[in-house]
Amino acid sequence: MGNIMSASFAPECTDLKTKYDSCFNEWYSEKFLKGKSVENECSKQWYAYTTCVNAALVKQGIKPALDEAREEAPFENGGKLKEVDK
C-alpha cells in the first residue's frame, strides 16, 4: 500500500491535509520516534487544515448537527456520563 494518504471529506481542504500529513509523518518518524523532538512542528499546517475543515462544515450545513451531537455526548466529562436534566 505504501504511503497513500486519504483525501479530506472537503475536496477544497485535501491539499492542506496532504501538507499536514506529510509534515506530521516526517516529524513523527524522523524526530519524535528517535527522541529528537517532542513538540509537534506541524502546528501551522494543522491549524490551516482544521480552519478549512471547519469552514467546510459550516458551508455544507453540518456544523449545527455536529455541535448538537457534541452537546448530547454521553462521555464528555472524563469518561463519566453527563448528567441530563429531566
UniProtKB/Swiss-Prot annotation:
Subcellular location: Cytoplasm; Nucleus; Mitochondrion intermembrane space
Main location class: cytoplasm
InterPro entries listed in its UniProt record: MDM35_apoptosis
Disulfide bonds listed in the record: C13-C52, C23-C42
GO CC terms, sorted: cytoplasm; mitochondrial intermembrane space; mitochondrion; nucleus
Keyword list, A-Z: Cytoplasm, Disulfide bond, Lipid transport, Mitochondrion, Nucleus, Transport
PROSITE patterns: CHCH
Motif (Cx9C motif 1): 13-23
Motif placement: Cx9C motif 2: 42-52
Record GO biological process: intermembrane lipid transfer; mitochondrial respiratory chain complex assembly; mitochondrion organization; phospholipid translocation; phospholipid transport
Segments forming domain CHCH: 10-60
UniProt subunit comment: Interacts with UPS1, UPS2 and UPS3.
PANTHER family documented for this protein: TP53-REGULATED INHIBITOR OF APOPTOSIS 1 (PTHR46403:SF1)
Chain's role: Involved in mitochondrial distribution and morphology. Mediates the import of UPS1, UPS2 and UPS3, 3 atypical mitochondrial intermembrane space (IMS) proteins lacking the two major IMS-targeting signals, into the intermembrane space. The UPS1:MDM35 complex mediates the transfer of phosphatidic acid (PA) between liposomes and probably functions as a PA transporter across the mitochondrion intermembrane space. Phosphatidic acid import is required for cardiolipin (CL) synthesis in the mitochondrial inner membrane.
Similarity field: Belongs to the TRIAP1/MDM35 family.
Other comments on record: Present with 3870 molecules/cell in log phase SD medium.
Protein name according to UniProt: Mitochondrial distribution and morphology protein 35
Organism, scientific name: Saccharomyces cerevisiae (strain ATCC 204508 / S288c) (Baker's yeast)
